[in-house]
Curated annotation (Swiss-Prot):
<keyword id="KW-0812">Transmembrane</keyword>
<keyword id="KW-1003">Cell membrane</keyword>
<feature type="transmembrane region" description="Helical">
    <location>
        <begin position="258"/>
        <end position="278"/>
    </location>
</feature>
<keyword id="KW-0375">Hydrogen ion transport</keyword>
<dbReference type="InterPro" id="IPR004282">
    <property type="entry name" value="CemA"/>
</dbReference>
<keyword id="KW-1133">Transmembrane helix</keyword>
<dbReference type="GO" id="GO:0015078">
    <property type="term" value="F:proton transmembrane transporter activity"/>
</dbReference>
<feature type="transmembrane region" description="Helical">
    <location>
        <begin position="306"/>
        <end position="326"/>
    </location>
</feature>
<dbReference type="GO" id="GO:0005886">
    <property type="term" value="C:plasma membrane"/>
</dbReference>
<protein>
    <recommendedName>
        <fullName>Proton extrusion protein PxcA</fullName>
    </recommendedName>
</protein>
<feature type="transmembrane region" description="Helical">
    <location>
        <begin position="341"/>
        <end position="361"/>
    </location>
</feature>
<comment type="function">
    <text>Required for H(+) efflux immediately after light irradiation to form a rapid H(+) concentration gradient across the thylakoid membranes. Together with PxcL, contributes to transient H(+) uptake following dark to light transition.</text>
</comment>
<keyword id="KW-0813">Transport</keyword>
<comment type="similarity">
    <text>Belongs to the CemA family.</text>
</comment>
<keyword id="KW-0406">Ion transport</keyword>
<dbReference type="Pfam" id="PF03040">
    <property type="entry name" value="CemA"/>
</dbReference>
<keyword id="KW-0997">Cell inner membrane</keyword>
Length: 383
């Protein structure tokens, strides 16, 4: 490996380390905010405040707080020199970490409780940030830093697109190839010998009986139109017997095909799981890529996407869509469509989705992007 390749390799490794450190710090900052909101009424965490919970629980909360605050401070120390390489989303994460750390003292106490610093700063942090921005712009190495940040964002985009294509194409290819060359021949060969490979098919038999009845009526109708004498009983019985055998073979084929679909879907699920497990680092990169894309949208675009998603899955017209989806899945798997199950699913699952979504807006989106929540309320017609 050439010297340039070694340098690029270690540069990419350093970029991934920065991303991982920043992600850990961001999650720790969110944890601290959650503790403040849930237990301290959106105020600072203090050890001298009685929470009305058992002492063991309060001690656990303080331990989690101290560990998260230590991670935030360590993150700031490790990523401060590489601030110029961060994209917009990562800078927002870094600002959240700085905001959390600035609310507390810099030194962790040696005792069991965190010391809360409320001393005024000599200069506002915004002014210090302005001076730091000017210093970075005048730095002779700033151009290299910007280029390194661009390369890291480009690598992040390429990795995200690659893992997205792998997550889509690999399960589909495995499903088609395994179904056509492995599962289908094996099921066709073993289904006559192994009865459990054939579904019980009362629904298919009902459909076959209905088709046979319609076929008999068509024969009688054609006989009345095309000849003066109706079909004899033996001729009618023979034609119906041939049609019954044809319908039976068709029902057996549909039953066997449902078994093939089940095994093909399982192979696709296994392939998807393997890709996810083998590409965990790439999935974290893709998560950051999509976070940046989502946060780059305007408030109106975010609100529009949220309203579109909720109206499709939990809106007024969503029951029809869920009915079509469930019936399609049941047909694909060879299962009879149960109207009671469909109605129960429609009555419960969209409600659960709506509850989760409202909780997400209250606990996460309302803190990260309050303007998006205000725009969402205005577009949705609620106060």
């Amino acid at each position: 490996m050439s010297r340039r390749n070694w340098v690029n390799f270690f540069s990419r490794g350093q970029g991934f380390d920065l991303t991982n450190d920043l992600e850990r710090g961001y999650e720790s900052a969110l944890l601290i905010q959650n503790l403040e909101l849930e237990f301290y009424g959106d105020r600072l965490v203090r050890s001298d405040v009685e929470l009305g919970v058992p002492k063991s629980v309060q001690a656990s909360i303080l331990r989690r707080f101290r560990a998260a605050l230590l991670i935030c401070r360590t993150t700031l120390e490790s990523v401060e020199r590489n601030r110029g390489q961060f994209d917009l989303q990562e800078l927002r994460q870094l600002q959240l970490i700085e905001a959390v750390v600035s609310r507390y003292g810099y030194q962790l106490p040696s005792g069991g409780s965190p010391a809360i610093s409320r001393a005024p700063e000599a200069l506002p942090r915004s002014l210090l940030g302005f001076f730091d921005t000017v210093r970075r712009q005048l730095d002779p190495a700033s151009e290299e830093t910007v280029v390194a940040g661009f390369r890291r964002r480009r690598n992040s985009t390429l990795i995200s697109l690659r893992i997205l294509l792998l997550l889509i194409l690999v399960p589909l290819l495995i499903q088609q190839v395994a179904g056509a060359y492995i599962i289908s021949p094996a099921v066709d060969r073993l289904s006559p010998e192994l009865p459990f490979l054939s579904y019980p098919k009362p629904k298919l038999e009902e459909q076959a009986v209905e088709k046979l009845r319609v076929y008999k009526q068509e024969l009688e109708f054609d006989a009345l139109l095309n000849s003066d004498q109706p079909l004899e009983a033996d001729q009618l019985r023979q034609k119906l017997a041939e049609k019954a055998i044809e319908l039976k073979d068709e029902a057996d084929g549909l039953s066997v095909q449902a078994v093939k679909n089940v095994f093909s879907d399982l192979s696709a699920l296994i392939a998807f799981t393997v890709v996810c497990f083998a590409s965990r680092d790439d999935l974290r990169v893709m998560r950051g890529f999509f976070d940046e894309a989502v946060y780059g949208l305007s408030d109106s675009a975010k609100a529009f996407a949220i309203i579109l998603f909720t109206d499709i899955f939990v809106g007024f017209h969503s029951p029809e869509g869920w009915t079509v989806l469930l019936n399609g899945i049941a047909k694909h798997l060879g299962l009879p469509s149960q109207e009671n199950f469909v109605m129960l699913f429609i009555a419960t699952f969209p409600v659960i989705l709506a509850t989760i979504f409202k909780y997400w807006i209250f606990r996460y989106l309302n803190r990260v992007s309050p303007s998006s929540v205000a725009t969402l309320k205005g577009m949705n017609g609620s106060g």
